[in-house]
């Protein structure tokens, strides 16, 4: 199937009598309720269920193996190839399926808040609530922008269309396929809305580095003086909590680009976890869930329509989607200068990493590539004790290119803009999980505040004898003994053994990076 034929098929779909283009939020909410796709909560949000798929489905994600990208993609378990033939046949079937629908919903908008680098996109949805979701998550065009909007990438989403693995070359009924040549994302068999968000992120992770822009899975905020901070970290490390600072404005909570102009948000909204959400713990998120927001897999009371964020009957991965402007303390447009401070967050359940340490450029690249945190008991079947987990660049499921490309760009930008990088352990202290205790949140906030203010740049440090990290000896508001992890353990020999064990896990994980420079390994990794 040629690109011309793809465009003809899209044109027919977009110009069909069933296509509802660029409906407003109230119109979409009405459609959701009339079509019985979801319910209205007491705060005016739409609550919808995603059926059996309550999270991303990484084994069902494919990139079409096309001549123009075959040598660029890091093929493997994350970036699974699928043939053009399989894609073309499935695409044709999905289009025929959607043409028969009574209504389709189309959103036109952008990915990328910096106008110089933004990607015009369109999303064709079978579900009205999915269209409301993308309306809130991506960047909404002005009326003037809409008149000249020409999409450069299209998501075609048909959650009720099920693939046949024997015929379609998929692993299950669900599929998320990206064709870079045809500029199409094809989604079916799953109702989980996050697949649309993360597909565009994966695309930006391919396109932006080609323009010399580092794409990053991180949150970002900016201080009153214009000083920018990035927060990288896997799930459960405190990224959302620690980047929501009343004294700093939020640039974005999840996906960013770093260009020669500075940092920009890729999105126009937030997709926040809301398990155990309360006004006391996360006031910004709690208050943002108003009319037009989307709650995913959250149980609501049949009578009062009040959301019960503590109920995980459907999944622990309950989510809220809302536009950036639903938060008070933000920067709009979501662009800022170059980062002054970069924070890597890790929840180390072995209790051996320092609560904060300063990183050299090589150490920053090493820990960026490592993307370390701990997987705790109970999060997955078969996990009975905490396990080290490594997610390359703090976002391996979304990286189409070789990881070293992103790390090299980070190193170059750190050096060029003199960004200070810190590794912050929000995990355990005084012993491993089950013996020690979780790091005091007040101490973590004080350490991050000291890093952001520049205080730590002039603080005396000591080199950690196993990890080679520079550990500050004094941080305002934090007891000195907390800063050196060995001092918090009653059994010093047990500390050393556990630290060496983790250092060896870092080294074993790093063996997969055969294309990185020796400097990163020799100057960035553990020294014992």
Swiss-Prot record:
It is an enzyme of class 4 (lyase). GO terms for biological process: gluconeogenesis. Binds 1 Mn(2+) ion per subunit. Keywords: ATP-binding, Cytoplasm, Decarboxylase, Gluconeogenesis, Lyase, Manganese, Metal-binding, Nucleotide-binding. The keyword Cell inner membrane does not apply. Pathway: Carbohydrate biosynthesis; gluconeogenesis. Its EC number is 4.1.1.49. NCBIfam families: pckA, PRK09344.1-2, PRK09344.1-3. Involved in the gluconeogenesis. Catalyzes the conversion of oxaloacetate (OAA) to phosphoenolpyruvate (PEP) through direct phosphoryl transfer between the nucleoside triphosphate and OAA. This is Phosphoenolpyruvate carboxykinase (ATP). The gene is pckA.
């Amino acid at each position: 199937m040629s690109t011309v034929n793809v465009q003809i098929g899209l044109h027919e779909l977009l110009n069909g009598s069933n296509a509802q283009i660029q409906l407003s939020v109230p119109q979409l909410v009405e459609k959701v309720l009339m079509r019985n796709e979801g319910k209205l909560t007491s705060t005016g949000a739409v609550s919808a269920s995603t059926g059996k798929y309550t999270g991303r489905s990484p084994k069902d994600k494919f990139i079409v193996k096309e001549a123009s990208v075959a040598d660029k993609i890091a093929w493997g378990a994350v970036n699974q190839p699928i043939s053009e033939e399989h894609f073309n046949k499935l695409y044709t079937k999905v289009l025929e399926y959607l043409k028969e629908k009574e209504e389709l919903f189309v959103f036109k908008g952008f990915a990328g808040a910096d106008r110089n680098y933004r990607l015009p996109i369109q999303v064709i949805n079978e579900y009205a609530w999915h269209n409301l979701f993308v309306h809130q998550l991506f960047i909404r065009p002005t009326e003037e922008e809409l008149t000249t909007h020409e999409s450069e990438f299209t998501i075609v989403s048909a959650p009720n269309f099920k693939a046949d693995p024997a015929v379609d070359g998929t692993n299950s009924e669900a599929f998320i396929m990206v064709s870079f040549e045809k500029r199409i994302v094809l989604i079916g068999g799953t109702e989980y809305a996050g697949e649309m968000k993360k597909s565009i992120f994966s695309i930006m992770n391919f396109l932006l580095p080609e323009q010399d822009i580092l794409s990053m899975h991180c949150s970002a905020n900016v201080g009153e003086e214009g000083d920018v901070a990035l927060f990288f970290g896997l799930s459960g490390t405190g990224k959302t909590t620690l980047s929501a600072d009343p004294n700093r404005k939020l640039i974005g909570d999840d996906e960013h680009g770093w260009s020669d102009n500075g940092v920009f948000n890729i999105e126009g909204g937030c997709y926040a976890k809301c398990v155990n959400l309360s006004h006391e713990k996360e006031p910004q998120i709690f208050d943002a869930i108003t009319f037009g927001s989307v709650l995913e897999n959250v149980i609501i009371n049949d009578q009062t329509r009040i959301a019960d964020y503590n109920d995980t009957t459907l999944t622990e991965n309950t989510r809220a989607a809302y536009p950036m402007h639903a938060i008070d303390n933000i920067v709009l447009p979501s662009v800022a200068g170059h980062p002054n401070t970069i924070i890597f967050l890790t929840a180390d359940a072995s209790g051996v990493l320092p609560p904060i340490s300063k990183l050299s450029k090589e150490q920053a690249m090493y820990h960026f590539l490592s993307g370390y945190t701990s997987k705790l008991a109970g999060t997955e079947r078969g996990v009975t004790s905490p396990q080290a987990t490594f997610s390359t660049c703090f976002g391996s499921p979304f990286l189409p290119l070789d990881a070293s490309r992103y790390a090299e760009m980070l190193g170059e930008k750190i050096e060029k803009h003199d960004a200070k990088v810190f590794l912050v352990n929000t995990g355990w202290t005084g012993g491993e999980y089950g013996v020690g205790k979780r790091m005091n949140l007040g101490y973590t906030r004080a350490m991050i505040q000291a890093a952001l203010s520049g205080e730590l740049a002039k603080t005396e440090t000591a080199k950690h004898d196993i990890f080679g990290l520079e550990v500050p000896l004094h941080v305002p508001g934090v007891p000195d003994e907390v800063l050196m992890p060995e001092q918090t353990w009653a059994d010093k020999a047990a500390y050393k053994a556990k630290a060496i064990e983790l250092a060896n896990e870092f080294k074993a994980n790093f063996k997969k990076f055969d294309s990185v420079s020796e400097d990163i390994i020799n100057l960035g990794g553990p020294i014992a």
